[in-house]
Amino acid sequence: GIPVELVHMENTPFKETFKGLHILVMSYSNMKPMKLEYHNYLADWVKKGGILIYCGEDIDPYQTVLEWWNTDGNEYKAPSEHLFEKMNLSRNPGEGTYRYGKGTVIVMREDPKHFVLKAGNDQKYFETIASAYQKKIGKEIETKNSFIVERGPYTIAAVMDESVSKEPLTLSGLYIDLFDKDLPVL
């Protein structure tokens, strides 16, 4: 499987935020950064060797609200323009792969929702992530029909009906089936 975690933009000033993080997928579709300073930390992380995958067309109506990127002397059409500029790219780079320091910026000019709403678009997204993972980690992504998340004493597991295989997931120990109204211990 692939180790996945959420990174909150507001936490970028803390060094621990990027600890162990190799690839970061981000978008400003319908959500915008509260402060331009966050881009300093993102750009620094990429420069040191991180891979940033930016997904977005930057055309949603929230680009035009009066915010830091278009007030107080800033003349950016979208906050991403400031981020790209920080990484020595053009303000509006086309879809492609770019180097910045020891790191890489991959721009996918697609609104993230279209990866699931347009038939076949998920494959392009997956292949981009898989390629970045292979480049950075040196391993192929192992696709499975199940998810397992462990947090402390809790294990959350699910098997997908529509997936790469019909292989059952086997776990040892005692578990409660939350999808059964009687909550049996298995």
Each model region followed by its residue ranges:
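Short helix-loop-beta junction
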Residues: 1-6
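A conserved amphipathic helix/loop scaffold
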Residues: 8-9, 13-19, 25-186
